[in-house]
Amino acid sequence: MATATSKAKPSDRIKMRIRKGDTVQVIAGKDKGKTGEVLRTLPNENRLIVEGVNMRTRHEKPTQEGETGRIVNEEASLHASNVMLYSTAKKVASRVEIVVEKDGSKKRKLKKTGEVLD
């Protein structure tokens, strides 16, 4: 099994249908029910970073003389299986399906609402 610092093996990777800028809802873990925008995806690790979710506190030492140390709150990554795409219009989380248009282009569509994302 892959750790957070190593890359997932090709057999362990999941299809990430979530992209940067999407709104997602956390469906498992300590932040269950929270929604936020995806800031970054890490497809090699099956993880993503969501704005305002899974916050971690990091302590920084002073780097120069006369400077004081700081406490920084930042988002930690979540596993992609712990989030679902979220419809802001209908206020509901949904699975996503890939729809092939007549011109051959692929679009992402929410299954519950029918909302097309791309």
Curated annotation (Swiss-Prot):
Subunit comment: Part of the 50S ribosomal subunit.
UniProt GO cellular component terms: ribonucleoprotein complex; ribosome
Gene name in the database record: rplX
Signal peptide feature range: none
PANTHER family to which the protein is assigned, alphabetical: MITOCHONDRIAL RIBOSOMAL PROTEIN L24 (PTHR12903)
Keywords: Ribonucleoprotein, Ribosomal protein, RNA-binding, rRNA-binding
One GO biological process term: translation
Gene Ontology MF term list: rRNA binding; structural constituent of ribosome
The keyword Chaperone appears for this protein: no
Cited function: One of two assembly initiator proteins, it binds directly to the 5'-end of the 23S rRNA, where it nucleates assembly of the 50S subunit.
Protein name: Large ribosomal subunit protein uL24
A Pfam family assignment: KOW
Homology family: Belongs to the universal ribosomal protein uL24 family.
